[in-house]
Amino acid sequence: MRLGITLPHYDYSLDSSKPISFSDVASAAKASESVGFDAIYVSDHLTLDLGKYGGSPDSNAECFPQFQSLDPLSTLAALAPITEKITLGTLVLCEALRHPVMTAAIADTISDISGGRLALGLGAGWHEPDYEIYGTKMPAVGERMSRLTENMKILRSLFNGELQNFDGEFYSTHGATLSSPIDGEAKSRLPIPLFIGGKGDRLLRIVARYADGWNTCWAFEFDGYSERVDSLHRACEKYDRDPGSVYQSLGLYCLVADTEKELDEYFTRMCELSPRGVADGKDLESWRKGRLVGTTEQVAEQMAHWANLGVKEIIVNPGFAPFHVGSNDIIEHLGNCLHKACEIADLTN
């Protein structure tokens, strides 16, 4: 089992009283690599409010504060030369915010800088403020799936080293390529794993047809996830693809400690570190449901169950809102506990 972790890159990710800086992200990335995580991930929102996750609005404002984020692709490019082996991933890019040719060119550059360590995740988009800030309206789900399909067609062709001429309903390109004329071979510099985030039936058909991997997050119970895996397998059968060739990663909120007493103390600390309102009304017992929560031995049992459902990588989120991390010692604590859990469950790489 590979282990990934979310990186802090929103203003609320560490200390919501001050803006996030790249030095904060770099420090967290180094801590993640040092403790043995296999991958680090950033997301893609122009801004994010915490109302969806229980956050409280400012007392003098009529709406939730809009927390700013560092750009994901620029951040990964900057992290590439200061890390060594860890995978650098997007979880996930909003397909509508960049033309696929530009996405491919940037991804190819980051892959080159990092020595082939980029994992490119793409999604159909769900956060309406991203579209409003971009100056457009968020399309209905059907149109977003159609746009994602066209985007993936172009990316897949470019990553395969093909000369791309494409006229679609949403995207067009003529003569785009990542191939180099120097060596005469049709290929990009280094292979770039391409995965899709989401869980709907149509999205899983897009995964089966175009993607190397599939991700969904942040809370899932075993039965619900198993049903989604069955849908993925049906999609693979439709396109005559081996389901085992689809790399499954799963994002989960995570709290783990060696003993119940330590787990309770850890939960209390995460509540204290949370942005205002996010931890309100939460208790440890209810937080266990659908999340990677428990003692090291309990989490080992859960991870073994996820592995039996085809999960090859678990991406943990330390806090109670996406990409809320708290502090670097939280990263180190999670890394140490999760490696113990992998050993107990015989899931070490």
Please describe what each predicted stretch is:
Residues 1-38, 119-121, 139-140, 153-156, ...:
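C-terminal amphipathic alpha-helical "assembly" element
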Residues 52-64, 107, 258-273:
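Aromatic- and acidic-residue-enriched segments that line the glycan-binding/catalytic groove
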Residues 68-74, 198-199, 294-298:
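Short secondary-structure boundary/capping elements
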Residues 90, 96-210, 230, 243-244, ...:
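Internal, glycine-rich beta/alpha segment that forms the wall or movable "lid"
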